[in-house]
From Swiss-Prot:
The lineage of its organism: Bacteria, Bacillati, Actinomycetota, Actinomycetes, Mycobacteriales. Keywords: Cytoplasm, Hydrolase, RNA-binding, tRNA-binding. This is D-aminoacyl-tRNA deacylase. CDD domains: Dtyr_deacylase. A Gly-cisPro motif from one monomer fits into the active site of the other monomer to allow specific chiral rejection of L-amino acids. It catalyses: glycyl-tRNA(Ala) + H2O = tRNA(Ala) + glycine + H(+); a D-aminoacyl-tRNA + H2O = a tRNA + a D-alpha-amino acid + H(+).
Amino acid sequence: MRVLVQRVVSAAVSVDGEVVGAIRPDGQGLLALVGVTHDDDAEKAAQLAEKMWQLRILDDEKSAADVGAPILVVSQFTLYANTKKGRRPAWNAAAPGGVAEPIVHAFADALRKLGARVEAGVFGAHMRVELVNDGPVTVLLEL
């Protein structure tokens, strides 16, 4: 499982021109782009959610848990692109939608159980993500 975490001052995700999830924190928040591979499960999702929630990448070495920073979760199968051969990425390392969708939901649910305010995109939809990256700070987490 991979989560590309970006520290943001705002982020929103739209489907068909309609905003389906948005965060506009008073300070900082996190955008989490979540990729799932074949051997991932809800337990890994919970472990990665805990790691991200406690990750000290906000101002003054604070974590989202420390300040109650909101989180926007967006599924992102392209995090498992294989570009070693040719010019066209291969997606065989990404879990199929039927496997990945409940794991992405488990990740968001685990964050909520930790106390996070979570907004989310729509799994499998063509989404437009708008964000204002702060820093910029972008970190790849992987289990």
